[in-house]
């Protein structure tokens, strides 16, 4: 299967703990079930080791008993990067910013935006999603926006005048947190430094860090920090204050819905991400 695979291979098995396996009759490296059939159960770590040893490559946990192995390492990075790219809804905040700044926006710039509102809104939301000005191939209507505004940079400046820079600065902060989590989890997985990477990641590094090495150094500090129980406890309290939901058990745990994962402090995202890499996604 690995020889035939072009970009990736997904491998899955049945996973069970000792409490389940003990219910059956041991037989060689598996068990005999109540239906008198042979079944081999794996522990998550055992299966990862088997896959990586057999294929001689890194395996990424996608769930309990499910691992993905990438032949295409650029695709692998793109997959891992997308895992940490939180899709945030900027629309409500954009509308709020628009109302507060409508009166102060320069008439000429306001006229341009109002005349092509859907186009500029799409561009603005793309910029907020990326936390930076999108490259030409990162915005679906690049040709149209460049015809109207001259360039992506000029369109962005018009929109900053229209909406203000507060929301964009917030988007930059959030996107850099996504990248910090991505790089920290890459270090946790002990993945080798990449000689090839997606073009979008190269742009991210250029926009948010001085260099790739700077990104790794910052991620290393963040990764080691999550080994401090006091820091995690403070992060849980902060997350509870931010989300205003979930179950906080003082000195023990904080339980919240995984849909809010992108809204919690980055150190807590890294902490959870380490567990996810070991045991699979939070499904």
Report residues per predicted region.
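Conserved class I S-adenosyl-L-methionine
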Residues: 10-32
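Conserved S-adenosyl-L-methionine
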Residues: 56-67
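Conserved beta strand-loop-helix elements of the APE1-like EEP
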Residues: 68-76
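Short alpha-helix
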Residues: 35-55
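A short glycine-rich, Lys/Arg-flanked "PGG" loop and its adjoining helix->strand segment in the class I
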Residues: 1-9
């Amino acid at each position: 299967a690995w020889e035939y695979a072009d970009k990736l291979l997904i491998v899955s098995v049945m996973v069970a703990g000792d409490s389940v396996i003990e219910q059956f009759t041991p037989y060689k490296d598996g068990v005999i079930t109540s239906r008198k059939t042979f079944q081999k159960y794996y522990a998550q770590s055992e299966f990862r080791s088997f896959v990586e040893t057999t294929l001689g490559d890194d395996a990424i946990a996608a769930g309990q008993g499910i691992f993905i192995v990438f032949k295409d390492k650029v695709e692998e990075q793109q997959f891992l990067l997308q895992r940490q790219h939180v899709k945030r809804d900027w629309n409500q905040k954009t509308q709020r910013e628009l109302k507060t700044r409508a009166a102060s926006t320069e008439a000429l710039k306001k006229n341009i935006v109002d005349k092509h509102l859907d186009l500029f809104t799409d561009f603005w939301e793309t910029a907020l999603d990326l936390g930076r000005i999108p490259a030409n191939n990162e915005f679906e209507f690049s040709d149209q926006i460049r015809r109207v505004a001259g360039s992506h940079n000029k369109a962005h400046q018009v929109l900053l005048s229209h909406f203000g820079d507060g929301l964009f600065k917030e988007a930059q902060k959030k996107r850099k947190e996504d990248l910090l989590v991505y790089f920290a989890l890459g270090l946790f997985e002990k993945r080798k430094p990449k000689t090839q990477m997606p073009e979008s990641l190269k742009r991210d590094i250029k926009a948010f860090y001085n260099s790739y090495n700077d990104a790794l150094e910052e991620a290393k500090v963040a990764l080691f920090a999550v080994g401090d129980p006091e820091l995690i406890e403070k992060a849980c309290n902060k997350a509870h204050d931010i989300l205003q939901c979930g179950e906080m058990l003082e000195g023990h745990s904080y339980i919240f819905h995984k849909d809010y994962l992108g809204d919690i402090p980055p150190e807590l995202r890294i902490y959870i991400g380490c567990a996810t890499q070991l045991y699979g996604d939070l499904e």
